[in-house]
Amino acid sequence: MKRWLAMICVLCCLALSGCAGAEQKGWTQEEWENVIMALASDDEEPVPESRRASFRSGWLPSAEKGFINLLLISSDAPDIDRNFGRADAILVCRTNLWTGETRLLSLPEDALVTLPEAPEPIALRYVNCFGGAGLTARCVNDALNLGISHFCAVNIEAFIEIVDALGGVTMELTEGEAQALDAAPGAQRLNGDQALRYVKLRRPGDGSIRVRALLTAVLRQTAEGGSMKRMVSLADLLLPCVDTNLTTDDIVDLIFALFGQSRPVSFDAMGFSAKDGVLNAELAAQSREFLYGGE
């Protein structure tokens, strides 16, 4: 019996050491340079499949009682089931499940973060290519210590279905944007097709400003004007379009928190830019103060 136990222990140690070796496997200079070049191009799959990490529950902390800290990503992935596209927008959403109070923090996609095993920091928007929204949430936690426990990724074209399901979204259009969309300047209600055209109106320097603006507007307008019945129907439509670690119970809790209140919920949004591309201690403190301040 002792011999069998000893053999099992040895095998387990060998297996664990093998996993550790795989986890710590580095990149050759040529591999890394090829990936960096592909990330900067329009290649749909810049990271080799053998280098993509699958989500592990140990990457993220357990959820804080009474709250959900959710990383929300919009991706350019053509197939959300694979979810390894570049991130168009990265938002942290903290919801109080008792009051429905929600705070939405927009993160700079071009900020540099440390990726496990990588030889150098990379832009936050590229982390999704290596390990989806789960790995992105892990890197954000490492950089800013925000206690993100959940993630949700949606490709932007699928997100447009949500816009139509909501009956459109109101956006403030500049004269140039309005002309491109065959609409009038100012506040306009956009349908899904118009919203997709809106986010694709990119000029040098625009980055992903419109994607962030659209996501924030949809979340705000949904929280302010939705109903529980409508949101349950929307959740049924949304789930096939997303990659998430939210459970059914989590989703029910969120819907009840946001739409089951007897009064309108508080919804605040904030964004910041990273000086020289660095998420430093000052930005980490500001982010935590915004998400957790006053609690």
Please report, for each region that a protein language model flagged, where it lies by residue:
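C-terminal motif of bacterial Sec signal peptides marking the signal peptidase cleavage site
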Residues: 17-18
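Flexible, polar/acidic helix-loop-strand segments at domain edges
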Residues: 61, 157-237
